[in-house]
Amino acid sequence: MSNLSPDFVLPENFCANPQEAWTIPARFYTDQNAFEHEKENVFAKSWICVAHSSELANANDYVTREIIGESIVLVRGRDKVLRAFYNVCPHRGHQLLSGEGKAKNVITCPYHAWAFKLDGNLAHARNCENVANFDSDKAQLVPVRLEEYAGFVFINMDPNATSVEDQLPGLGAKVLEACPEVHDLKLAARFTTRTPANWKNIVDNYLECYHCGPAHPGFSDSVQVDRYWHTMHGNWTLQYGFAKPSEQSFKFEEGTDAAFHGFWLWPCTMLNVTPIKGMMTVIYEFPVDSETTLQNYDIYFTNEELTDEQKSLIEWYRDVFRPEDLRLVESVQKGLKSRGYRGQGRIMADSSGSGISEHGIAHFHNLLAQVFKD
């Protein structure tokens, strides 16, 4: 039996019929008890996309990521193997590294100067030779499962987890089809926000283009909503639509088969292949608590020296498109706590699965029901 409060139990068939569906109750977006359940049953057991492989391409490259209160360090060893560890010294718990950059050949704890090789093994602990029964095997860094998949880096805190492909079957091939240059991408810009919104609120917003017309005029000037589809693939979904050139957003040659591909990956990552060749954007979500989500919005191009047009596009994302979505989810988070909100919202899923249908939200909420079932 589950230890869940009855207030946080959903039937297994919740949202199974999108055309009759309502959202999960508002308390699932605001209550810390729901988030604590998600920490253990979603984020500690799922593959989470945390970076593009190009950020960790060379020996000694490292990045750190914070998710559900855990700090994780990813580092490529001198043997070229990429590994992940909990970013904590086994001696007394001090964090080892911060930010990102180039690690030295050993990672030295700033507290008592314990030193660790980049494969996680203990290199040296001061005075250990004078400590009875000191066991260096019990002084190694604790590893975190890591896989490189479809050009990106995924981690999983469950040591018994199966592969990324098992969680997201078929995704890698489809990403490569949409963006053949995915392995050649390089980080061009990152916008980091500590967003006052629940992670599911942000996913909901991504999983529908019903709001695109009213809220994203520049984007809507390029996407052809009458030639836009959203297909469900288990733990991932694909939004696909043909594009047209726009002076407000995406500029490219008329007459091409340019398109948008928007991949949502359970639980909280969004990969976007734009109509611009050799470009992707990625939204990485790192939940902090029930009403706070750290987000990295990354923009990638295949070329390192950016063109003026690429710089202008980055500015449009930074100053126009990204703030539009942030305002939406922040407002929704406030509204979910209002006495005037009836607790659940009707999911606007139509029978044809049109470009403005919200059936993607129903699919997501049905997956959530499997986490919150009794």
Swiss-Prot record:
Domain of life: Bacteria
The entry's keywords: 2Fe-2S, Iron, Iron-sulfur, Metal-binding, NAD, NADP, Oxidoreductase
EC number: 1.14.13.239
Database matches in HAMAP family: Carnitine_monoox_A
Protein purpose: Converts carnitine to trimethylamine and malic semialdehyde. Can also use gamma-butyrobetaine, choline and betaine as substrates.
Subunit note: Composed of an oxygenase subunit (yeaW) and a reductase subunit (yeaX).
The protein's name in its UniProt record: Carnitine monooxygenase oxygenase subunit
